């Protein structure tokens, strides 16, 4: 009987669906394991082989944990709101719902064809009103707690798409050729900064890749510094700056404020006013990326005004430059060009003083010195001296002096900014707020607030979404008076901030999630997805989760206990797969040629899960041959299955089997799937060599392989006479004594150089190891004519002879 993968895979996929094999019960008597994918945006291009890598990894773990007795939650859904569907609607007039349903159907079919063991009864879709009803409910809780507010803010406005971009989205859109400018708009903003300290501190409790945690730390950007007040004698005001280097205050030679600073135009003297206004206008058209790039040429305009340095009484010129941002610190900085490269470049360009206050190994007029390891110089007045102090001591002394003299205060700052939560588009969750004629705001009480039908999906020319054109939806009257609905919609991130909770209780119409079910299933035990979400989805989801924790909706402080980032699978040209490069390998095409089991195994065998690696279609041929070898253990002839025996295995094969169980178990636990597969290949070779038809050996192989290649294992398990599916069979357990090597290879060195090896029984004494090493012919010649100074034996590993000539 031939291995017909297509027939076999269809058969078992139908069996699993008909029998609801992977339906998850909320059984508090069993240990739970929640394994989750970062759910996909269902694009029109479908899934390619690169997308399948993470899904395959989570499915292996889900199947493995079930076989180890865990109650496994392994769900799938769709992050289906988003700009691509709306852009398609603008081009074709097709409603985004139609496009989304079609794309979801395509994605679902591909995932089912791969044999992934999702509990499809828990499927969710962020565009389903029964889902986004609770997204809207969470927003109203944020509003009630003062964590959602409206503000006129400068936003990243994409002219081509007519939509506001989050700071994190700007780079991608510019790279795609879109024009992005800064523009003031009325926006909803979420106060994520209120949770900055907790978002930072709780990272230490998470089993996440260190690089991802560091990316979040950098994004939050906590810094300890000092706010210093500089007197503006001609204006009877103070200009407050924030600095993390108060130890360099004596070296400040000028101040810089942002173009948006409220004093920017007020400080301009008459000769400077026109030039300054033009500069401010041009700066507001630039994105933050354009303004702050390290390679950007420094620009600025002198206001004509001066501020007094509180440390030495010097009058410092006040400049306006676009590299300073209002959104960080106070929107004003003190510049110490001797010890900051950006300040040094600015000072050199505009001929400003450069004053050394940190002892430098070179002339700071020629080269900046930014080191903290040196001592302070030229830093004293009648009240304070920093001369001779290191950074830590100087920081403390200056901060103490500034506070005690009333010239400023210690301050903790964050780079993290509040999250602009509005989008001027149609295809998103409506924000459930009504604006009344008296200026008041009230929440929608009847959720969900759904989207109306529209004739055109183009954003309005005023910057509002297409919802502003639907008057019968927009305006209304209730007991509080006439109102106008909010026309902004939520960003795509909203639905993905909490979806892991809805999988726990997807049909609950009364609550976001049942408390008992939430307490049982949370946290997510393993979350697999791309590292590109480190400071977007992951940070936003952590923020919302902490809000829900404070509200008593969830019982854990963090949503995802363990995070694993899979490496990208590149095209065969070693480039990222994309339509524009023409190197996309559709998942369905490869499955049709080789079968789902071969694709699953090959994806995991390519290399370590976390590494980037190129796809090689020729490589999957080898995996296909391996599966055929597994098949021939049970079906060695064309006619039918071989007769399996219960004759005991010999000692060597028994040990090989237990070593394989041990290796595959440990590697699967640690997501080292490529080496687990390699170990199973070795075991298959041993079975073929021995002509083994032993039932125990075969069933062990199938149980080990089943999480990786479930279809072929189900078929062979049934052929071996088992009635229950292998998906419900327990994982094999190794005997530690039999899993250890009974013979070890001992390396023999002479003066640290390898001169030979020999096989020795496990547990051999040091004396016996040394005696055995002396008998190796290749070693003897290096001992002849030598005096042995020392003999070293490391049990089970090596013998080393330290020698010198007689």
Swiss-Prot record:
GO terms for cellular component: cytosol. ATP binds at residue 579. Pfam families: Anticodon_1, tRNA-synt_1, tRNA-synt_1_2, tRNA-synt_1g. It catalyses: tRNA(Leu) + L-leucine + ATP = L-leucyl-tRNA(Leu) + AMP + diphosphate. The keyword Flavoprotein does not apply. SUPFAM superfamilies: Anticodon-binding domain of a subclass of class I aminoacyl-tRNA synthetases, Nucleotidylyl transferase, ValRS/IleRS/LeuRS editing domain. A motif ('HIGH' region) lies at residues 40-51. GO terms for molecular function: aminoacyl-tRNA deacylase activity; ATP binding; leucine-tRNA ligase activity. Its EC number is 6.1.1.4. It is found in: Cytoplasm. Keywords: Aminoacyl-tRNA synthetase, ATP-binding, Cytoplasm, Ligase, Nucleotide-binding, Protein biosynthesis. A motif ('KMSKS' region) lies at residues 576-580. Its main location: cytoplasm. Transmembrane segments: none annotated. One of its GO terms (biological process) is leucyl-tRNA aminoacylation. The keyword Transport does not apply. Gene3D superfamilies: 3.10.20.590, HUPs, Isoleucyl-tRNA Synthetase, Domain 1. Belongs to the class-I aminoacyl-tRNA synthetase family. This is Leucine--tRNA ligase. It comes from Prosthecochloris aestuarii (strain DSM 271 / SK 413).
